[in-house]
Amino acid sequence: ATKLAIGYTLDEIENDITKSTPASFEPALDYVVVKVPRFAFEKFPEADTRLTTTMKSVGEAMAIGRSFPEALQKALRSLEKVGASFKWRTENLAELLEKIGIPTEFRLQQVQSALFNGASVDEVYKITRIDPWFLEQIRLINDQASLIANSGELTKELLKSAKMMGFSDAQIAELRKTNEAEVRQIRSNLNLHPVYKTVDTCAGEFAALTPYYYSA
């Protein structure tokens, strides 16, 4: 910014990440960053839990993934709060549709549950006005959850697709009605392990010199 202020042009400034391309080089991103606010209403029992234009969060969690569903699920788990991660349980749809009309701390989870329990994307959009693109991404997560729960066995392809959608071993175990250690052992036997990707601005086209990585 300082160099630009004194007259440098973008093509004269070095990209700090690659050290080999100019700042004018069009960035290409192969990752998604999701930030989720963290609330602490349990510490303030008399506070109004409805979300308004007033800031009520006490912090946030950030996650990086290769896709929006992966980054979203990782961010929710990073809140380290009971009820933050998605669950796939049978609930009363009418009650859920009533709840999602009021923006609260757990509205996102209620929207996910409503979609899982039979609500359509259009129906949820009319109540919440959440952009259908985001609702469709949540629906895809639910579809993957159903596939995990109802498949005969955990194949390498199924586990790989589940991980690409951001499912943890614990979530897969809950859907399969087994334990986390067993899922981890199956995954290990199938040679499926986390890898670490570099955060850069060129989608791996050039070597990045910044020590900034995320697991995927």
Where are these regions (language model features)?
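ATP-dependent carboxylate/acyl-activation modules
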Residues: 1-216
